Amino acid sequence: MEESYSARPLVGRWLALELRPTRPLTWLGPSWAVICGAVASGGLQLRGQSALLLIFSILLGDVLLGAWRALWLQPDWRDAMRRAAVNTPAWYIESDDGGGNAVRRLARQLSRRFRYVRSVILPVIDSEIIGMTMIGVLALSIGVVLGQTVVLLTIGAMGVALIEGQMNEERGAYLRAVFEIALPWLIAQTVFGYFAWLSLFYVLVFTLVYRALLGLLGGRPMRWILWNNLAQLIVALVLFASHAPAVAGLVALGLLAQVLWQSRFRVNRDGRAYVQCVQSYILVTMLATGLALWF
């Protein structure tokens, strides 16, 4: 990574923006959470303004915040930082035992740290710093257009991503589920101006479902199978109690289909294949649940 620094052109455009799908044929994620949140708000209409707000919400909740998280979590710059630190001259980092009063010693230490950052750290991660800065500015700018609450949710999402980067994969998966399901859903629901406490309950349950799917790709899969089934069963029961028996039946049928797929999963233990097979049922469950709040 650090070798690419010297190969960069000296003149030309400053920034590069690349948009591409990060996962082939995978729909369950922030974009779908935004759509379901917009539907759950009851404010999504067949009008040009609603379509524009939905596009801005997807751009914020998936593209920009996802890019922020990806830049922060990518391992390349962390490995490059470690290699650069190993090759750093000793005078950059050794302690200052020189004479002088405390103010002069402090000034020399600060000067050494500044040179270390400028000469060692910035050449390695300057692209990431610039990228995160620009993405943060764009995300907050869109948030300002969409409303004050969206700005707060955007700042919260950025903070969640930063905290996730300091955790291991198992514990960080909880924050990833919040980042990719709960916050995009709430952003869309806030954008369209309607809020229901029952919707907040549903988004928390679907965040748990998403966390369970992430867990199936790691260790202790049967534990997450149980959580996945229990969470969707709760959704079906709450829908039935909320006088939406048709949607409750649809959710129950989707859960039954997943249980049938689980019999195959117990044999081959292929979590990735199982998630790819059952995600369509969860997509329908999320959308139908959002519709049930207002129809």
Placement of each model-derived feature along the sequence:
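Short acidic/histidine-rich active-site segments
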Residues: A173
